[in-house]
Structures are given as C-alpha cells and as structure tokens.
Amino acid sequence: MASVMSNNNNNNNNNNASYMFTNPLSNTGGGLINEIKDAINEMEQLKVLELKQICKSLDLSITGKKAVLQDRIKQFLRKSCDIGHIDPWRPKAIKILIAKVRINSSLPKYSTLWETLKTGAFKHPVASGQLPVTALQSTALPPYSQQQALAYSFTSPFYKPIVQIPDANKKLKQSAGRGCTKMKFKVSKSNHDLLKSNKSYKLYLFSGFSIPFIYETVGHEAIDFPYPCELVFNGTKLEDNVKGLKKQNGTGNPANLTPYLKVPTEMNHLDLHYLNIDKEYSISCFIVEVFSPEALLGKILKRPKIIKQATTAYIKRTLNEQDDDDIITTSTVLSLQCPISCTRMKYPAKTDQCKHIQCFDALWFLHSQSQVPTWQCPICQHPIKFDQLKISEFVDNIIQNCNEDVEQVEISVDGSWKPIHNSSAVITDTVNQNHSVKNENQGTVKQEQDYDSRNAFDTNLRNGSNHNEPEIISLDSSDDEAFIPASKSFPTHVNPRNDQLRADIFPSESEGSSDYNPNHTSTPKGSPTMDQDNYQDAFQMRSFLNQGATTNINDTPTNNSSINSFVTATNGDSRIFYNRGPSTPLLPAVLQNLTNQTEAQRNPYGPNYNTTAQDRNLLGIEGDLPPIPPVDPNSEAETELPTRTTSAAHLPPYIHVSTSGHGDDGKIRKRRHSNVSIYIPKNPYATLMKRRPQANHAIMNKTLAQTNDFNTSAQDNSEVVDLTSD
C-alpha cells in the first residue's frame, strides 16, 4: 500500500512539470513546526529593507536593526503554535510575502492574504479555478488540462496563450555559477496544424519567477528571463531580446521558436545557458496568438475616451493651485509632439491615473512596448497597464483642429486654447526684440526677431547666401579643432585654411565655383578684408598672418589661435549653436558693427589695412597708421608693432577673444577657454601680438603660422566674461 502511494506521489510530481508554476503551499507534509522553520530560514535571508516591508504588511514596527526586525517576525510566526490558537495559515502567508518581496513586488496586507488562504480563495497561477482548502494540504496538483492553459494570461497584452506544450516545462534552480537547462519535447501534429491555421499563432518560450501569487495577480504573469542568458533551439542561437533591462523585472520578451520548429515526428532540443541567478525561474512553451501594435490600437480606439470636461476641470484646478499672492497663472503650454517619437501626435493617449494633460501617441507607445515592455508613462514614469490607456478627447480635438505646422498650444484656465507659432524661440532677450541700430551709411535699421529662419539658415549657409543669415557664435569647439569659416565667399587674396574641411561642411562648393578656387599657389596672406564688396554683411573671426606674406595652399598652416569660433552679422537675430544642433537666440544683431571693430582691432598693423572708413570712424581712429615694418626672417629680434591709442569703451563686455601664441622656442602654446565665453584684449593696441620669427628660413616657408603669428598676454590685457552669468 505504501509503495502504491509512493508511486502516486511520484506521478503527481511528474505532472507538476507540466505547469509553468508549481504551488509552494503544497510542501506542508512536515507539519506546522517544519513550515515555521522553513519560513524563518527564508526570512533570515532577506535584507533590512525587505524585512521592513514584511513587518509593515504584518502591522509590526519597522524600527530597529536587522536582528530586531528578524526577532519580531520570528515571534509572529511562533504564535502559530500557541495553545488553543493553532494557525496553519500564518507561515503559508509569510512565505508568500517573502516570495513577493524578493522580486520587488508590492505586498498585500497580511490580514487580507490570511483570509484569502483560509477561505480557499487563493488561486493557482496556472489554473483558472479556485483551489479548495484541502488542496493546500496536499502535495498533488490537479492534472494538466487545456482549459487551464487557455485561462492563463500574461501581463503583456501582445500575447494570448492558446495551448501549453506538454513536456516543455522546466524549473531553474538558484545558481551561483554557470548553469544550463536542457529540454526535449515534441509538438504534436494537431498543434502543428494549429500553427499553420493562423499567421498570428506562434510557438513562444516564456519564462517567469517561480513564486506564488495571491488572488490579486492570479493569471497575469510578468515575463522575466535570467540575466544574462543564452538560448539555443535545435542548434540555432536565438537572437531574440529576451533579457530585457537589467534589474528591471518584466521588461523581457518571449523567444519565438516557430521558425526553427521540427516536424511532429522529430524531437526538439532547447538549451538555456545562464549565469548567477538568485531566484528560481520556470520556463514553458506556449502556442500563443500574437497581437500587433496596430491591433491593440484598435482596442484602445473602441474604449470610452477621457472626456473633455474632466481635462478642463483638471486644468482649472491645477492653474488655480499654482497661484500665489504675487503671481497669477493664467495659461499653460501643451505640446502636440509625442515625447517618444518627437513627431506630431495622431492618437493622444494617457491614463486616468496620470496627473498631467500632456499625452503621448498611443501607436508609438505600443511599438516601444513591443520592443522593451517597461509599461511606464513616458511623461510621469508611473506604471500603467494596457487596459488603462485611453484617448484624451480634449487633446484629440486640438490636434484635429490645428494646422500640421503647429507644435504647441497655449491653454487658458477656461479650457480655451490658441496655437503658438515660432515655438523654437525659447530663449530671447526682450530688450533686443525691437532694437534700432544707428548705421552711418545705411541709416536706421529696425531689427526684428525671425525665429522661423532656423531651417533656412542651414540652406543659406550651404548655398553661400549672405542674406538674412542669423548671427552665429560657435562655442562648442576645442583648441585642437580646425577653424570653420563663417562665410562661403572668400576674397581672392585670402586663402581658405582647410579645403577638405570646407568641402565637408559646404558640399555645394565645387572646383568650378567662382567663389572657391583651390589653386591659389601664391596668395598674399593677411587679415581678411572688411570691404563690403567682398564680405557684404558677413565677417569671420580668426587670427591673422603677416600682411604680404606668401605660401602655397598645401602648406597652409592650421589656426593657432584658441578662438575656434566665428561670428557672422546680419539684420536677423543672433543664435548660439552647440554641436551644430538646434539654435537658441542669444545676442542682438548690433553685433555686426562690433564684429567690424573686432576684426580691425585684431589686425596686428592697425585697423587701417583693408578696412572701410566707417570701421575706422567707429573705432575712433583718424588717419593712417605707420607703414608695415620690414620682416627679416633670419632675425631673432622682436619687431615692435606700431601702436595707437583708442577708446575700447564701446566694445560690449561679452566679446572677448582669448588668443594663444608661441613661446620663445617657437612651439605653439595654446590656452583653453570656456565653452560659453568669448575673449578679446581690453586694449588691443597697447599689447598687440608681436611676431616671433624663426631663424630657419625653410621652416618659416613651410609653417608660416609658427614663424609669423603673434603672441598676446592674456593675463595682462584680457578678461574673461561668462555669458551664462548675470
């Protein structure tokens, strides 16, 4: 008789393998004392934070050290054996709480869980029916049935189980090292025919934590594979993204076995390699129906929408709460762009639990969840479920009645709205929005902000257009980067520094262009001309070589100045660019005249060379400077530059150009500057750059910058101004 019972128990244990999850409440044969000991042993492996969560569920104090918390739970468990108060459900409930806290799952109240176990309302995670009380005291589980498999479901709405494959189930024990689980199974002909009957039917391998679940979450299991792991099915390594995000449960995806499935008469082999798993996993194969994001979107569209009145009431309540004694909030801004795709929303959705009016595109959200199922709101990061997603009637009405180019709308307290145009104008100086510049030759010019020109700017720059270009101050380059010219047009006597760089930046240029001639073999070097006929309204900041010097284009040296920035001036607004990304208005268009002054002042021989009378007048300079002193390339003596007193009070405080030159040994010495600062000497004529020519004439001809460039003392006559400071 005993042998028969033993055989029956063995058969029942084998039947347990056909379930994705076994019932941990079945191990009660050792009596209540053994259950209490097992619960205590499992409890002692928990961390302090986990112990506090258990105590909170038990309505015990959560203060004290780890040993104190453990003693409280031990005493609570030992009360199960009090005389006259035998409680067999207490250790069972504690085990469930321990299992749930190990996977960072929310814990129910102990009293609720205890009542559920006592009344038999606790459900097996696979079976759909309720387990009777007697089932909790037995080691046997109900036999496998297809109806039970059909009742099983996952938290992911993309998969609906149809049939669970027999013998394709395994449990992965905790492992401190490498491990491998092998599984062999056949798929019957009827299941093969089922897969062929519908294209949406697939054979998938699922994995999840082998833990008990209470009635609140029964029938809904998150997909989790060991991390890291590797799957090999019938000799093929599966590339499916089953691992998900590290340390984020429920972000994995099942593995698709359908393409590698063998015929019904052959055995399928599955190998799962894993490393260092601290929890038990159960893996199982299901034939499931796969739903596409578009199919799920159809379900969302059939649901009732979040009514407009609820949204307007929230807007009114929120704006009124933000009011204080000094500031009254009258409106808020709503973006019509999806935060996931950064494109115009078509199906604005959110949940009733989200405390914001901003929505996201439902279809884009479903596509993202099909890849990495985090199931968090992309705006507030709160957990959401598929069944909670709804279309916002208020936002949907705005999208339907707005032009395609509108990206934001302004919403008033009463729920009315109006489109916001030119939404790229995020930062602007209101003082400079309508700034009048007195220009001696051109009269009075009214400067107006034109933020819609951000797209036209790149086009005009590449096409060499000098009209309506925004002013640019590039502050993202380092000392070692090559100089990027601001204008496509170069005067015939100014040689581009780097033809390859210009070809990369301005692909529209070609060798046949009238503005670009790569065959300058003996072009005089010097400061760029300020003649309006050549440069019109665009000017570049750069360091300069000697007037009248010559060099071959192939020997053109790189810029040794640490400016690595350029400024162009137009009648448009000014913008600052970071990494050639989106532009932000920063400086006024009055920078045009300031650029002229800067160019003239940086000329080592004074502003009279290649400058207009207007520039000299702006600088307060009358007449011409002395002629250029002769340059002896074999002389080690420093040639003093002609100086001229002038007033620098008209220069703005934020235009300061830091320069670096050469030491006495002729080597380049660079000075690094802030990414948000531009420098220029306070009095450039008092300590302007001095040449340090090399004695070696051959070196001079080859590396002109190292022989004829200039050195400025930044410590004596320059100051640093941070544009980000007040």
UniProtKB/Swiss-Prot annotation:
Residue spans, zinc finger SP-RING-type: 323-408
PINIT domain boundaries: 139-291
Pfam (any one): PINIT
Compositional bias per record (Polar residues), positions renumbered to this chain: 510-533
Keyword Acyltransferase: no
Localization (cell): Nucleus
Superkingdom as given in the UniProt entry: Eukaryota
InterPro entries on file: PINIT (IPR023321), PINIT_sf (IPR038654), SAP_dom (IPR003034), SAP_dom_sf (IPR036361), SIZ1/2_SP-RING (IPR031141), Znf_MIZ (IPR004181), Znf_RING/FYVE/PHD (IPR013083)
Record function comment: May act as an E3 ligase mediating SUMO/Smt3 attachment to septins. May be involved in chromosome maintenance.
Other remarks on this protein: Present with 3170 molecules/cell in log phase SD medium.
Family membership noted in the UniProt record: Belongs to the PIAS family.
Entry-linked PANTHER family: TONALLI, ISOFORM E, ZINC FINGER MIZ DOMAIN-CONTAINING PROTEIN
UniProt protein name: E3 SUMO-protein ligase SIZ2
Native source organism of the sequence: Saccharomyces cerevisiae (strain ATCC 204508 / S288c)
Top-level taxonomy: Eukaryota, Fungi, Dikarya, Ascomycota, Saccharomycotina
